[in-house]
């Protein structure tokens, strides 16, 4: 009988405790409240510290690292596809973009050339070509040849089609048009 009383009393206490407990508030929270709470937590110093620790964790960094082969494949597909070729053709028609791109490449090319000029092997090779006694004769023959003239014409055409030159030429034309408009007024 005492076991039955103890069991009955335990059940009664358990029911009364659970009946008096507050409702589960997590079920009542809507999305906006949860979002605000999470944002507030992340803005605290503890939240920022937790994120920094998470980003410094090696296992997490390994999970975040993207497969380099996948990146390479995506870039190759994007750049070499017909859509990619069309995209690059269209974007390089924009003189402002082409100018910026050319300026970026120009600085890199200048760095490479300056590095080469400091390279002793490159200097020796360049000097041996320049000091060759027959080079003067070859230069004058070359300048008179039809091949050189064709090459020179090609270089001039390339220069005229260069994004940097186009931009400079465009700017000069605009400036000249403004000056002409001012003079005629």
UniProtKB/Swiss-Prot annotation:
The keyword tRNA-binding does not apply. PROSITE patterns: PROKAR_LIPOPROTEIN. A lipid is attached at residue 20 (S-diacylglycerol cysteine). Its main location: membrane. A lipid is attached at residue 20 (N-palmitoyl cysteine). It is found in: Cell membrane. It is a lipid-anchor. May be involved in fructose recognition during germination. Keywords: Cell membrane, Germination, Lipoprotein, Membrane, Palmitate, Signal. Transmembrane segments: none annotated. Residues 1-19 form the signal peptide. InterPro entries: GerD_central. Pfam families: GerD. GO terms for cellular component: plasma membrane; spore wall. This is Spore germination protein GerD. It comes from Bacillus subtilis (strain 168).
């Amino acid at each position: 009988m005492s076991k039955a009383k103890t069991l009955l009393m335990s059940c009664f206490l358990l029911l009364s405790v659970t009946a008096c407990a507050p409702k589960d508030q997590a079920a009542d929270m809507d999305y906006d409240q949860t979002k605000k709470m999470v944002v507030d937590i992340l803005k605290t110093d503890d939240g920022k510290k937790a994120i920094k620790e998470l980003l410094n964790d090696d296992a997490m960094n390994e999970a975040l690292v993207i497969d380099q082969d996948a990146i390479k494949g995506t870039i190759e597909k994007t750049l070499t596809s017909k859509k990619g070729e069309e995209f690059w053709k269209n974007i390089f028609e924009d003189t402002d973009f082409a100018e910026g791109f050319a300026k970026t490449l120009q600085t890199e090319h200048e760095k490479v050339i300056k590095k080469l000029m400091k390279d002793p092997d490159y200097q020796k090779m360049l000097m041996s070509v320049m000091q060759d006694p027959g080079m003067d004769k070859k230069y004058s023959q070359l300048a008179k040849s039809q091949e050189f003239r064709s090459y020179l014409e090609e270089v001039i055409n390339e220069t005229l089609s260069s994004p940097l030159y186009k931009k400079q030429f465009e700017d000069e034309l605009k400036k000249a048009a403004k000056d002409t408009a001012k003079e005629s007024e």
